[in-house]
């Protein structure tokens, strides 16, 4: 499933939307979300840390297990273990930032293949 969601990620107003996404992505099983804050790297480490923490808190609050994958901020997009972590997700969530940067960081990588 692919869901393109504009701004507002991790806000209280998005709980119902994200709960529906989790339900549809994982069915009756427990949801496992991978949050990828790569698009925020140009805004600095504190912004990456903020998106990481917000995403983890938000989806854990919805009952999902959460793995934050910091591609470009300590983790490689071509690392097979990173790709495996992404492939294990029932929902992959790319948080806010610069979409063009995200595209350049992931295009043609093992991480992107795992997301598809």
Predicted regions and their residues:
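Extended, subdomain-level signal for the structured scaffold at the beginning of enzyme domains
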Residues: 1-101
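Glycine/threonine-rich flexible loop motifs
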Residues: 99-109
């Amino acid at each position: 499933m692919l869901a393109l969601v504009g701004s507002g990620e991790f806000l209280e107003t998005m709980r119902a939307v994200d709960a529906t996404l989790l339900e549809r992505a994982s069915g009756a099983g427990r949801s496992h979300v991978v949050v990828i804050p790569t698009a925020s790297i140009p805004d600095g480490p504190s912004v990456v840390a903020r998106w990481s923490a917000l995403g983890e808190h938000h989806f854990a609050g919805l009952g999902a297990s959460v793995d934050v994958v910091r591609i470009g901020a300590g983790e490689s997009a071509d690392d097979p273990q990173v790709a495996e972590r992404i492939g294990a997700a029932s929902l992959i969530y790319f948080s806010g930032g610069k979409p063009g940067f995200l595209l350049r960081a992931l295009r043609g990588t093992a991480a992107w293949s795992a997301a598809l």
